[in-house]
Regions:
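Core segments of transmembrane alpha-helices
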Residues: 18-26, 80-92, 118-123, 145-157
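C-terminal membrane-associated helical module and adjoining short loops/tails
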Residues: 1-23, 40-53, 128-129, 133-213
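Membrane-embedded alpha-helical segments that form the functional core of polytopic membrane enzymes
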Residues: 14-16, 21-72, 88-96, 102-115, ...
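Residue-level signature of transmembrane alpha-helix interfaces in integral membrane proteins
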Residues: 29, 35, 72-75, 93, ...
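Conserved G/P- and acidic residue-centered "switch" motifs that form tight phosphate/ATP-binding loops
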Residues: 56, 77, 119
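Membrane-proximal helix-loop-helix units in multi-pass membrane proteins
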Residues: 102, 116-135
Length: 213
């Protein structure tokens, strides 16, 4: 690999991995920034979250544009996505409960479970498929899920934490619609992957074959 190509590779991997410290900045500000959150800290947390969301698009775009797609990137990108979900959803549940939106907090718990359950279910199906020589490329539902998830999480945070005198407000119906859409796309994605890997799942459900005599 040439020096120029190596630096392009490092640049793309850096875009992926920088998501983790950005998420930690968001977490630290949300937990320890005080309540109500000062405007400066709100801007810092929101900016960190928006940058983390943007890197999810930038890393894939630049990897293809610079022709430095790699196996490391194919594993690191979903890993950092999971880190994003694992950090942001519990934080949003905490923030919703803190401002007295207990019903909203309960729904966010359900939404978090759906996101994490979908990831675990797809990983399980892929592992099962590998035993039977069956694989499936990423489909539209996975891409749609990611495309919807990041704006939804950012919108929820803005809705919960934006200062009272902030000029721009996100209406509750918009936030609610995004949350329902996110829940729906997770269920759809689980169904699509289940259908793709059904032959492997069906073979395993039949139980072990009798040993040859």
């Amino acid at each position: 690999m040439s020096v120029s190509r190596r630096w392009k590779f490092y640049f793309v991997q850096g875009l992926t991995l920088v998501r983790v410290p950005l998420i930690l900045v968001f977490l630290a500000v949300s937990l320890f920034g005080g309540y109500p959150l000062p405007k400066a800290w709100f801007v810092v947390a929101l900016g960190a979250m928006l940058l983390a969301a943007a890197t999810d698009w930038w890393d894939g775009y630049f990897a293809r544009r610079l022709e430095v797609t790699s196996r490391l990137g194919s594993y690191a990108d979903p890993m950092t996505d999971k880190a994003f979900y694992l950090t942001t959803f519990p934080t949003l549940v905490y923030l919703a409960a803190r401002v007295g939106q207990h019903g909203h907090a309960r729904f966010l718990v359900v939404l978090a479970i759906l996101f994490l359950l979908r990831d675990q279910w797809v990983s399980f199906l892929r592992s099962l498929g590998a035993l039977h020589g069956l694989s499936a490329a990423a489909n539209w539902s996975g891409k749609a899920r990611t495309l919807i998830a990041f704006p939804t999480i950012c919108a929820i945070y803005y809705y919960l934490q934006a200062p009272a005198d902030w000029p721009l407000r996100i209406p509750w119906p918009v936030v609610c619609s995004l949350e329902v859409l996110s829940a729906g796309i997770n269920l759809v994605s689980m169904g699509i992957y289940s259908r793709q890997f059904w032959p492997a799942l069906r073979a395993e459900l039949r139980g072990p074959t009798d040993p040859a005599r």
